[in-house]
């Protein structure tokens, strides 16, 4: 069939295909792209990863994009929904704003929803990690329920019913000890809680204090106060049995014995096993308006500034170090990439989701030296984390850096281009983590400073150029982790973490949305957005803080 000027339909299709496919790689070479163009690019990156997973690993929890390998996490090979459940709210957010791929996003939402409803079964006779399953699976289901409702896409009941089933199974973990601090794992079929197999049975402090948002939101949706009460029980023994506010200035060692509530280690850090303890203090306040949690957060932030904060040489980059021997030990200049969430956390705590221009007109900000200090530090930490990308040979940050404090012996370590940090040989990997782009997103929407979009575009470009597989063929292109982001060319690893889809690409996408009201939503630690809860409904359900100091 031909049109009136004699060009065949096949030719037209070929021309459109060429326009559609060829320019994506070239587009990433451009500078200062518009917000709409960046959204299109990020949608394309997401869908290229998603299509590849759907074709070669659908339904499996773990996926290797290079070799198209897949497997499930629990013993017995039953799926937890690790990738699908973690990603469905990203599908929804992109569906809502997409101009190029709206119908494809809608179809994939429906496909995921059917799989969750018809295939996913949490009656699994195997141990799962309580923390990871809560933040990814329970959080993902609750966020999908929320977005399905407000965006009017899919069947919200599917997500809530599945969340209740999983929440009931996970809640049994809190009944395993007299303190209410759960063991690290639980058998989803039997309800048997299992201690950590290492570290003398101690639980990660961040893990059992990063369950509260999910269970409080579930309590709010169902009216079941038990969820709320169970997750609040962990705090009283933690604070009182350790004299946390006085002896530790609000800072927590990274392990806690669940049977006693006493700390089981000396190391204090804002990286792994410490990070989200601080995050959920603030976010419980933002989600539920409970002022106790802001007061605890405030104490922790002042403790961090007193004991952990330092600046690098030669550029005076602010970083949050570690105290490996407790508060009276030497400050280590080591910082995990995980710590880079702190820029966004400090900023959102400072303004409570308002733009900085609006917050400065409000007494809660204008009369608070601490909030002003938080805002300045948020800018500093976000800049530091951007420099971890900028000063890297690939434009991507490694998993861990050691900042130059003038005293470091760096034999065999890689030195950044300016010299502000070093990277040890075993810390060169890049898992496509979200924390830096998370903070960049918050800083942009709270300040409207365009430089943050420029930084985000640079990082997206570096991900595209360095983590893609079959880069020049859009039909086969997908993205994977790196075992080495320092040596050029970078070395790829056969694994795609679910947070690439659930967090990193989501935060990059939101960065380029024209409007995003951060006073209306609170993200859990896996980037699943929950709505700020209505105070009158909370009051009517008697959902209030159940402990005090």
Swiss-Prot record:
Consequence of gene disruption: No visible phenotype.
Pathway entry: Protein modification; protein glycosylation
GO cellular component: a single term: endoplasmic reticulum membrane
Top-level EC class as recorded in UniProt: hydrolase
Residues annotated to bind Ca(2+): 525
This enzyme's EC code(s): 3.2.1.113
GO terms, biological process: carbohydrate metabolic process; ERAD pathway; protein glycosylation
Intrachain disulfide bonds: 340-385, 468-471
GO MF term list: calcium ion binding; mannosyl-oligosaccharide 1,2-alpha-mannosidase activity
Domain of life, per lineage: Eukaryota
TM stretches of this protein: 5-24
Glycosylation sites: 96, 155, 224
Substrates-to-products reaction catalysed: N(4)-(alpha-D-Man-(1->2)-alpha-D-Man-(1->2)-alpha-D-Man-(1->3)-[alpha-D-Man-(1->2)-alpha-D-Man-(1->3)-[alpha-D-Man-(1->2)-alpha-D-Man-(1->6)]-alpha-D-Man-(1->6)]-beta-D-Man-(1->4)-beta-D-GlcNAc-(1->4)-beta-D-GlcNAc)-L-asparaginyl-[protein] (N-glucan mannose isomer 9A1,2,3B1,2,3) + 4 H2O = N(4)-(alpha-D-Man-(1->3)-[alpha-D-Man-(1->3)-[alpha-D-Man-(1->6)]-alpha-D-Man-(1->6)]-beta-D-Man-(1->4)-beta-D-GlcNAc-(1->4)-beta-D-GlcNAc)-L-asparaginyl-[protein] (N-glucan mannose isomer 5A1,2) + 4 beta-D-mannose; N(4)-(alpha-D-Man-(1->2)-alpha-D-Man-(1->2)-alpha-D-Man-(1->3)-[alpha-D-Man-(1->3)-[alpha-D-Man-(1->2)-alpha-D-Man-(1->6)]-alpha-D-Man-(1->6)]-beta-D-Man-(1->4)-beta-D-GlcNAc-(1->4)-beta-D-GlcNAc)-L-asparaginyl-[protein] (N-glucan mannose isomer 8A1,2,3B1,3) + 3 H2O = N(4)-(alpha-D-Man-(1->3)-[alpha-D-Man-(1->3)-[alpha-D-Man-(1->6)]-alpha-D-Man-(1->6)]-beta-D-Man-(1->4)-beta-D-GlcNAc-(1->4)-beta-D-GlcNAc)-L-asparaginyl-[protein] (N-glucan mannose isomer 5A1,2) + 3 beta-D-mannose
Bilayer topology annotation: Single-pass type II membrane protein
Cofactor: Ca(2+)
Ranges per topology, Lumenal: 25-354
Record's keyword terms, sorted: Calcium, Disulfide bond, Endoplasmic reticulum, Glycoprotein, Glycosidase, Hydrolase, Membrane, Metal-binding, Signal-anchor, Transmembrane, Transmembrane helix
Record: active site: 399
PANTHER family hit by this protein: ENDOPLASMIC RETICULUM MANNOSYL-OLIGOSACCHARIDE 1,2-ALPHA-MANNOSIDASE (PTHR11742:SF55), MANNOSYL-OLIGOSACCHARIDE ALPHA-1,2-MANNOSIDASE-RELATED (PTHR11742)
Family: Belongs to the glycosyl hydrolase 47 family.
Further information: Present with 8260 molecules/cell in log phase SD medium.
Complex formation: Homodimer.
Function recorded in the entry: Involved in glycoprotein quality control as it is important for the targeting of misfolded glycoproteins for degradation. It primarily trims a single alpha-1,2-linked mannose residue from Man(9)GlcNAc(2) to produce Man(8)GlcNAc(2), but at high enzyme concentrations it further trims the carbohydrates to Man(5)GlcNAc(2).
Name of the protein described by the UniProt record: Endoplasmic reticulum mannosyl-oligosaccharide 1,2-alpha-mannosidase
Originating organism: Saccharomyces cerevisiae (strain ATCC 204508 / S288c)
């Amino acid at each position: 069939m031909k049109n009136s000027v004699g060009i065949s339909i096949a030719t037209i299709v070929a021309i459109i295909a060429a326009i559609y496919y060829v320019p994506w790689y070239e587009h990433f070479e451009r500078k200062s792209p518009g917000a709409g163009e960046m959204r299109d690019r990020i949608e394309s990156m997401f869908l290229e990863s998603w299509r590849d997973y759907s074709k070669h690993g659908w339904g499996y929890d773990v996926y290797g994009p290079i070799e198209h390998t897949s497997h499930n996490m629990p013993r017995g090979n039953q799926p937890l929904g690790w990738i699908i459940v973690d990603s469905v709210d990203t599908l929804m957010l992109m569906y809502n704003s997409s101009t190029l791929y709206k119908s494809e996003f809608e179809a994939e939402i429906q496909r995921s929803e059917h799989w969750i409803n018809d295939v996913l079964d949490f009656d699994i006779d195997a141990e799962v990690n309580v923390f990871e399953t809560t933040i990814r699976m329970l959080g993902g289901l609750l966020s999908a329920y929320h977005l399905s409702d407000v965006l009017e896409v899919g069947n919200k009941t599917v997500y809530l019913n599945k969340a209740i089933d999983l929440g009931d199974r996970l809640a049994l973990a809190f009944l395993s000890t007299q303190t209410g601090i759960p063991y690290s794992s639980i058998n989803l079929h039997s309800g048997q809680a299992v201690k950590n197999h290492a570290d003398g049975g101690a639980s990660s402090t961040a893990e059992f204090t990063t369950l509260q948002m999910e269970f409080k939101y579930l309590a709010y949706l169902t009216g079941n106060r038990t969820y709320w009460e169970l997750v609040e029980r962990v705090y009283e023994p933690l604070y009182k049995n350790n004299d946390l506010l006085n002896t530790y200035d609000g800072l927590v060692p990274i392990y806690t014995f669940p049977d006693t509530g006493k700390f089981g280690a000396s190391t204090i850090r804002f990286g792994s096993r410490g990070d989200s303890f601080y995050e959920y203090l603030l976010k419980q306040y933002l989600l539920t308006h409970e002022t106790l949690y802001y007061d605890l957060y405030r104490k922790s932030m002042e403790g961090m500034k007193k004991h952990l904060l330092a600046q690098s040489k030669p550029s005076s980059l602010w970083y949050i170090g570690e105290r490996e021997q407790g508060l009276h030990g030497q400050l280590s200049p080591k910082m995990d990439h995980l710590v880079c969430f702190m820029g966004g956390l400090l900023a959102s705590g400072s303004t409570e989701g308002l733009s900085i221009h609006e917050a400065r007109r409000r007494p809660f900000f204008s009369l608070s030296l601490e909030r002003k200090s938080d805002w300045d530090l948020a800018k500093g930490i976000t800049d530091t984390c951007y420099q971890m990308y900028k000063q890297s040979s690939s434009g991507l940050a490694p998993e861990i850096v050691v900042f130059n404090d003038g005293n470091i012996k760096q034999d065999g370590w890689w030195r950044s281009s300016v010299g502000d940090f070093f990277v040890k040989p075993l810390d060169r990997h890049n898992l496509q983590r979200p924390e830096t782009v998370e903070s960049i997103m918050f800083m942009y929407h709270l300040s409207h400073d365009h430089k943050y979009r420029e930084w985000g575009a640079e990082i997206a470009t570096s991900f595209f150029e360095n983590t893609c597989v079959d880069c020049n063929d859009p039909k086969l292109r997908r993205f994977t982790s790196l075992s080495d982001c320092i040596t050029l060319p970078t070395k790829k690893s056969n694994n795609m973490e679910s947070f690439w889809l659930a967090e990193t690409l989501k935060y990059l996408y939101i960065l380029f949305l024209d409007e995003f009201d951060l006073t209306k939503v609170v993200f859990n630690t896996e980037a699943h957005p929950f709505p700020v809860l209505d105070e009158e409904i909370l009051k009517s359900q008697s959902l209030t803080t159940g402990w005090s100091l």
